[in-house]
């Protein structure tokens, strides 16, 4: 495969409850501008959390993330965030999204968050077992095989 070619990595996980603070960070001007660049829209002010059964560090080693660096904004420390461009399967088909892992997260290392242009819960509600299927676009020079978790 050509160096820099886009390859795909599929993650299979279960929705989990968050801490209720994702919306505040997604809506923050520092982060929302970065998500707007990546997604081409103003992101919905909230995240959908899922347990990917894959440690975020393993994901980062397999699929290099974009990094939103940490900063201090009006005296408040904002942590760095790893970001992967992705698509999430919904009852309407695939929807563009970003899979993120805030480096200051209080979640276990297998919990990732999804940012999208629209609220995802309503278009995932017909999924009683709370399964989440996400396809991440990876840019890597090495051969990465399609994997399911």
UniProtKB/Swiss-Prot annotation:
Pfam family, one: CTP-dep_RFKase
The organism's place on the tree of life at top rank: Archaea
Keywords: Flavoprotein, FMN, Kinase, Magnesium, Metal-binding, Nucleotide-binding, Transferase
GO MF annotation list: magnesium ion binding; nucleotide binding; riboflavin kinase activity
Known EC number: 2.7.1.161
Co-factor(s): Mg(2+)
Pathway membership: Cofactor biosynthesis; FMN biosynthesis; FMN from riboflavin (CTP route): step 1/1
Magnesium as UniProt keyword: yes
Catalytic activity: riboflavin + CTP = CDP + FMN + H(+)
Positions with a binding annotation for Mg(2+): 47, 49
Gene Ontology biological process terms in this record: FMN biosynthetic process; riboflavin biosynthetic process
Cofactor note: Binds 1 Mg(2+) ion per subunit.
Binding site for CDP: 18-23, 118-121
Binding site for FMN: 105, 113
Function: Catalyzes the CTP-dependent phosphorylation of riboflavin (vitamin B2) to form flavin mononucleotide (FMN).
The family this protein is said to belong to: Belongs to the archaeal riboflavin kinase family.
PANTHER family membership: RIBOFLAVIN KINASE
Protein name per its UniProtKB record: Riboflavin kinase
Phylogenetic placement of the source organism: Archaea, Thermoproteota, Thermoprotei, Desulfurococcales, Pyrodictiaceae
């Amino acid at each position: 495969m050509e160096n820099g070619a886009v390859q795909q990595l599929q993650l299979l996980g279960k929705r989990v409850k968050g801490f209720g603070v994702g919306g505040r960070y997604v809506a923050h001007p520092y982060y929302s501008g970065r998500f707007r660049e990546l997604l081409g829209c103003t992101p919905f002010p909230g995240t959908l959390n899922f347990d990917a059964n894959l440690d975020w560090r393993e994901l980062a080693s397999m699929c290099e993330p974009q990094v939103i660096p940490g900063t201090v904004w009006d005296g408040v420390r904002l942590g760095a965030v790893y970001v992967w461009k992705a698509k999430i399967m919904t009852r309407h088909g695939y929807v563009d999204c970003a899979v993120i892992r805030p480096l200051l997260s209080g979640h276990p290392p297998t919990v990732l968050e999804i940012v999208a242009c629209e609220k995802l819960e309503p278009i995932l509600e017909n999924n009683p077992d709370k399964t989440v299927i996400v396809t991440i676009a990876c840019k890597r020079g090495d051969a990465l095989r399609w994997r399911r978790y």
